[in-house]
Amino acid sequence: MKAKKWLLMTLGITMAVLVAMTAVMVYIDPYFHYHGPVEGRPYMLYGSGAYEKYYNDGIGKHFKYDAMITGSSVTENFMASQVENLWQCRTVKTCFAGGTLREIDEHVKRSLAANAGVSMIIRGIDEDKLLNDKDAMPSDPPEYLYDNNLFNDVNYIFNKDTWLIPLRYNLQYMRENHASTSFDNYSSWSVKATFSKKRTLSQYERPQKQEEAAYTQEIHDSIQANIDQNIVCLLYTSDAADE
């Protein structure tokens, strides 16, 4: 009888802890998987690079905006405030360091599906990515944040790294009443860099002359396939939806 009592008590405590952890994660929701920002509650967009793919889907689906800046790390220092000043629109920035064309295209599609009122996408297109396979994707995307499957959300709710870094920093922001991270600062590394002619020349090495690579039919087909599937297709789909 005592063993049964201890078993039931252990199960009860375990369930209570799991429910409490779930409630905290859903309420704070550092990656905006369940909801957008809550008015009066500051949030922190932590770091850049590896963390971007965790934040971006929630930003695209649950923030209120009219325009989006997206692309690879080349767009990380783009300033959302400049877009807002030029076109008088609410702007978010969702960059994917090393992102492939298909990865970014899939992100834009999910974002537009959740925000029909978006009027402008400013998208960086890296020339070298056009040479990749049109279906190239990153090796470790957090798919559990991209879909609507509640069962695989255990990977988010009970993720140790999520508790130790983004959730902890969000709680700190709330406690200390910091201002939320702006989309000028999110992903940006420019404040940590020094820009000058002297700095550039100190790291410059003149490249050796090389023969110009031949523009083959294989290269042409790769570029065309990328453009058709990961750029132009979305434009045609959007135009058809507007008609």
Spell out what each predicted region is:
Residues 39, 91-95, 203, 207, ...:
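Generic preference for well-ordered secondary structure
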Residues 1-5:
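N-terminal Lys/Arg-rich, disordered targeting/topogenic segments
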Residues 236-243:
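Conserved small/polar residues in nucleotide/adenosyl-binding loops
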Residues 30-93, 99-110:
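Membrane/wall-proximal cationic-aromatic binding patches
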Residues 125, 134, 138-235:
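Secreted/periplasmic serine-hydrolase-like ester/acetyl group-modifying domain
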